[in-house]
């Protein structure tokens, strides 16, 4: 099963890699393809083309390299509408003040002028920042692998407590207005039984 999931991911990676950056980037974050959306939604929104949404932004950097294009899309979509929004809401909910020093205006204005070769290369990420860090910090810190803040949702969803909690939400009257609840429960059951890793899809619907 694990091997088959890896094959699917590898195949999708190769398919995306064969497409133009304007077609594949941002599409990487899709949780459901068109067929899956048609199955779970009672009133599907029809064929959705993310290129229509991103085109005005890609047009502004059409003469730039692919890395710069992806960064521009990230800044205008993912950064503003996703990760910063979530961090702000979750930190405020727990009375925490969160700061993002790398988004300081002066730091950002310097970073945006860097040639792509100093941002990332074939063997290193955040190349310029790591080289700067090497001057002041131990190598084990400056060269440390990037880590996010993942939580074990995949494991939690197999726990009876959380499985039942989400199943209750998926079969509720509110969910039934918008979703084909049998399809949602199918995703949940497949995950709990270890037949597929549906954790991100389940979490997307639940949230």
Q: Residue spans of the language-model regions?
A:
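Adenosyl-5′-phosphate
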Residues: 10-207
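Short, small-residue-biased leader/transition segments that mark boundaries at the very start
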Residues: 1-8
